[in-house]
Amino acid sequence: AYPDSPILVSAVTVGGYNMAKQIIQEADAIIYFPLDMPFVSESFVKRIQPRIFMPVETELWPNFLRAIRERNIPVMMVNGRISEKSVKTYRYLYGIWDDMLNTVSRFCMQSSIDADYISHLGADPKKIYVTGNTKFDQTYAEVTPEDLENYKKELGIENAYPVIVAGATPVSYT
């Protein structure tokens, strides 16, 4: 068990990979997730031999999950989320979704809406928990002037405008 178990983190996008390298320093390795093709998934799972698979958000890949299930490796979705649009699309893929959802032993969803959506797709309600968005639990490094300029560009904020950030702090934190 952790901390004696190695941690392998995978990402699908370049942005996800770079973010993982920046904020998950406990990982023993960070890789790009393998293509979800039967041979590739089988080979990867056989080589890595994971003790547990924890997909983040809704990264469920049918061939990979099949390879995991065949080896009785537990699966727990963390920070699960699913959009209304995705629910409408996914319900037409019932056979595939039913198979994938039955492989997952715990669904830790961001919100009650996400929990309802995953239940609507066929996940067992007894396996669904609302745990909140774990991205809010992260601590980030100081923002560099370059990062600040990039954020301003992304948000369309010009330098002349003041920026007000409002938040709430629970009484238990003070």
Tell what function each PLM region has.
Residues 157-165:
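Charged active-site motifs of nucleotide-sugar-dependent glycosyltransferases
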Residues 173-174:
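Conserved small/polar residues in nucleotide/adenosyl-binding loops
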Residues 1-130, 134-138, 142-143, 170:
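Active-site and donor-binding regions of nucleotide-sugar-utilizing enzymes
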Residues 141-156:
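A short helix/loop element that forms part of the nucleotide-sugar donor recognition site in Leloir-type
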